[in-house]
Amino acid sequence: MGFNVPVINRDSEILKADAKKWLEQQDNQKKCVLVIVSIALLLDNMLYMVIVPIIPKYLRDIHNYQVTFEGYHNETSQLANGTYLVREVGGRINFLDEELELGWLFASKALLQIFVNPFSGYIIDRVGYEIPMILGLCTMFFSTAIFALGKSYGVLLFARSLQGFGSAFADTSGLAMIADRFTEENERSAALGIALAFISFGCLVAPPFGSVLYSLAGKPVPFLILSFVCLADAIAVFMVINPHRRGTDSHGEKVQGTPMWRLFMDPFIACCSGALIMANVSLAFLEPTITTWMSEMMPDTPGWLVGVIWLPPFFPHVLGVYVTVKMLRAFPHHTWAIAMVGLAMEGIACFAIPYTTSVMQLVIPLSFVCFGIALIDTSLLPMLGHLVDTRHVSVYGSVYAIADISYSLAYAFGPIIAGWIVTNWGFTALNIIIFATNVTYAPVLFLLRKVHSYDTLGAKGDTAEMTQLNSSAPAGGYNGKPEATTAESYQGWEDQQSYQNQAQIPNHAVSFQDSRPQAEFPAGYDPLNPQW
């Protein structure tokens, strides 16, 4: 017997046995997997965005940059006692290479994530989903703790890059685990939609979370909180480890996933990957540039309102996830149309952003942008799992590594490209480019209409081929009337009889060395005699 648990007044061993029994049920396992993966994705995106309000000010406070003073002039005044007071006024402080160093610090996580993802997908396909996820979450715990305690730019850059290494394992294995546990199409779409909602929530709640805690308790506190949540989530993964889930195939051999390079060659997967990149380019372009544009075009906007401009669009994003899941259930063969509408909607909304003149007006196109992103992500991520199921091997590590690479490409190079475009051509040109690229890529998704029809035709073709092969086999062709044996009837005969318990053929009958049921003929049968 264990100890008595206070409040609920129950023995600890009984509670442990009840919890184990509850976890052994498949539906409860699925719920736990979804909660664990959603928390992991929430943490990863919070770590990506929480530094936005903290690090620029922190690097200035620790005197990380060389400083020059520009535009100052002396102003002299005489006090009543005859003392002259000289002040420098009218200038500004220039922090040398600030944008460059901030850009590398922001992009280092996504850049390393791009390079690690091919290896993480390969490892996940070989060893399963749970252990790589634990590795990724533990790496995120250590890297975030280092980031919390680091006091120099070099240490912060190292910790930030290490976060990308952990995210490459945690994100990919999390999405693959959902696809592996939720095998039914509608169920998988709903689960991935919930995970995507947590991704969006992490991106939107992280800046206010970091800003408030940084102002109240200093830099280490928000990062230490996130690091210990990472550790707790890694411990929770041990509850859902199922080492026997990915076993062997019908021949007793371990199932091997399709190599990533071969998945890249699949035109349907390549089309989905491109759409995921285009969907996230808008956010990757707008997030680092819209604040500066608002300060120029809407100078009377309070600073706190600029910081929470992305919070209202979170609700349309959740609504988009819900609508997409419902539409996929009603129109399962029109996934491509939902994604096409979302991409076009996103581009048109970006085109309208530069023409807004108030915060309330700006919220409307941003809401449509997030709604369109929800349509694209929620429809295409389940399709990646479906493509692997129908065209490759049902091992999901590499295909969701491709999805993670798509996100990382957008967020690694998006801020750099957007900054260059805004500097040379302006913010309006940036949004026109987003509109043009999204609307141009949207018709490409029309190629995905063949995904489900290909699956149907392939199944019919396989059945017809099996029927033809069995029709030409010697099982039923010796009586002059070839008998077609379908794959189902042949499999059913194998299930009912084993090779050792076949019906014994009399000695005077003609026997054939074949494992399937044979026709029996009377003694003296001559197949070449036309009398027979």
From Swiss-Prot:
The keyword Membrane applies. GO terms for molecular function: acetylcholine transmembrane transporter activity; xenobiotic transmembrane transporter activity. It comes from the Eukaryota. The chain crosses the membrane at residues 32-52, 102-121, 131-151, 161-180, 192-213, 220-242, 267-286, 304-328, 336-356, 368-388, 394-412, 419-440. Glycans are attached at N74, N81. Pfam families: MFS_1 (PF07690). Detected in most regions of the nervous system including the nerve ring, the ventral and dorsal nerve cords, and the pharyngeal nervous system. Expressed in most cholinergic neurons. In addition, expressed in SIA, SIB and SMB sublateral motor neurons. One of its GO terms (cellular component) is synapse. Residues 53-101, 152-160, 214-219, 287-303, 357-367, 413-418 are lumenal, vesicle. Disruption phenotype: Newly hatched animals are small and coiled, do not grow or feed, can barely move and die within a few days. It is a multi-pass membrane protein. CDD domains: MFS_SLC18A3_VAChT. Keywords: Cytoplasmic vesicle, Glycoprotein, Membrane, Neurotransmitter transport, Synapse, Transmembrane, Transmembrane helix, Transport. Residues 1-31, 122-130, 181-191, 243-266, 329-335, 389-393, 441-532 are cytoplasmic. GO terms for biological process: acetylcholine transport; chemical synaptic transmission; nematode larval development; regulation of locomotion; regulation of muscle contraction; regulation of nematode pharyngeal pumping; regulation of neurotransmitter secretion; synaptic transmission, cholinergic. Belongs to the major facilitator superfamily. Vesicular transporter family. Involved in acetylcholine transport into synaptic vesicles. This is Vesicular acetylcholine transporter unc-17. The gene is unc-17.
